[in-house]
Amino acid sequence: MRDVVIIYGGDSVENEISTQSGEGIFKNIDQSKFCATLLNIKDLKVDLIKQDTVIFIAVHGLGGEDGETQKLLANNGIKFTGSSEDSAKLCWDKISSKALMQKNKIPTPPHKIIRKDEKLDLKDQFFLSRESLFVKPNSNGSSFGVSKVTDFKLLDQAIKEARKF
């Protein structure tokens, strides 16, 4: 039987969903094949992990999806699920990951990057050619700070919300 430690939690705004993910994995893992332990990442001590144990990463957001957990585990020779540190870092940065997809001719929706101090020009063709759009922060999970904008008078408000994350 293989030892699996399911880590969840963390300090990000996605702690609650991470906890739900960890508990769901623990509840549904095949107990006849795996000896599973559910562990809050705050209690993880890499020096106590056995060599043949696999870490199942259920940590969402900062610390779990940005490459930091992957780096910690890889640097200590611990096997884990999911992508490598470099892949996680790249995916965490939406601008960089979108650029890589475009470079490799993978279709992505049109986008506009709005820098921190950039003044918004609603007469820009990008805005004029759309009935609605989504505003997302460059980093963080897939749902925090995301707004669908159908009234462009509310675009500034959506951008302010995204910048919180």
Feature locations, PLM:
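Flexible, glycine/proline-enriched loop segments at strand-loop-helix junctions
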Residues: 85-88, 110-114, 143-149
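Conserved ATP-binding module of the ATP-grasp superfamily
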Residues: 108, 144-165
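Short coil/turn connectors at secondary-structure junctions
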Residues: 1-2, 52, 109, 129-131
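Short Gly/Pro-enriched turn/cap motifs at secondary-structure boundaries
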Residues: 59-62, 137-138, 162
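Short acidic/polar capping segments at secondary-structure boundaries
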Residues: 114-119, 138-142, 151-155
